[in-house]
């Protein structure tokens, strides 16, 4: 590691340069490396090898952008909304006989002169946004982190200036003097700061990006040394890297002059750093639900099912109260909340379990639907709601579409992250006619519900993207637009006042739900025969049962088991599923 002078948190570019010098002394050749990592990734992975170290790094959002300093280390947690291709940049240059690097910097600098050796490298551009539907409880309290971070930057400021001066002493004195009076460096990006970590050259972030809501700050992430297959569209990722952000700079393609290098990519130019901060990614990791829990902890391995049973009982009591003391509806709701796609066979998404609660009109929806929607926001990291009205279906853009005029993928309502819970409210639906847009949107919703896929329109062709979204439908009668896996009439017996839950209880339930969803599951050979016999008997009794119905029963059995913290199906839980299904069908008669 670079030592205190090159603290990876407050002076990451110093650590990059220091490791570059070490790599050169060990035989690293920039001329033949094509930008290959020289040890930076391992350095930062080692430095941030545990959650306590990672938690020291500020999370970049519309709040922290007001105080976090450019060229320091930040985290951005978001969804990859668009992949903008590759960008060329001058990654290394030779200053006299000494190699220097511009890697992990927005601006490529190198002394003027035809004899200068320059190595052009490549990096990928990802346009990332905060995860759609991300709920407020997932946000970390930033005030304490802000104070700690500003203390650290203050302590390291003098060290960084001193050490950077020592490094620049080795450069030609005339070059430095020219830099003070005129700038001997070519800038590949007009108006952006150079890559030096000297405090005197760090622009102060006194401004605020135009968009200031917590869910609106995007980020242009620049990826190095990572296989293209490692990251894909709609992945939820935590990027840890160097922030570059200048609210004063408002670049426009019309203002570019001859100093603008041809290597500047159009995508970057169209997203000025004053509006879209850049993050030069050093390391990254894909995020699961547990990473949004405070402390990133799951419940202990299910060595003691009693723990799961107790938490399950308390959560069931809460859900039952929300649903007007309808215990059966609460049971089905819990199974629905634990569902996830764990496999695909042909066009079938194995593990999905959509739920349609019926007998809800506008009045009852305003009570039970509103309470339930609010409760799910407090329990799940990502939740979205779609009003199924004729007007909305006819006007909204559900599917993402490629706009080749600006070379961007324009997001749609259904471009959401895996693990999102989606509520579809059909209680406001009135008779009317769907136009072509409405028909297309209805088909997109139906395909999402049945196959867990969303169609993306790339103009010249269309492509289906697999997803994993929990879908809960509220309607007065059985939905004709959304044929759910489970249809259940809601039968509340009373209206309960909304129970206030403590933060500790809410966190326990979140951990419980995340843990149960993460558990593996199997059916023992002995019980497998019992299940097969019961399914055969069920089909003989009701000839209308198809393979999808039988698959749904197995999915419910899986959810029932993991809800008790168990990874193997028991006879008791299988019989509970069969009884629940019997009660559901009784209600439908």
Swiss-Prot record:
BP-aspect Gene Ontology terms: cell division; DNA replication; postreplication repair; sister chromatid cohesion
Keyword Nucleus: yes
Subcellular location: Nucleus
Any one annotated GO CC term: chloroplast envelope
Sections of the chain in a coiled coil: none
Function description: Associated component of the MCM complex that acts as a regulator of DNA replication. Binds to the MCM complex during late S phase and may act by promoting the disassembly of the MCM complex from chromatin. Required for sister chromatid cohesion.
Protein known as: Mini-chromosome maintenance complex-binding protein
Organism: Arabidopsis thaliana (Mouse-ear cress)
Upper classification of the organism: Eukaryota, Viridiplantae, Streptophyta, Embryophyta, Tracheophyta
Gene that this sequence comes from: ETG1
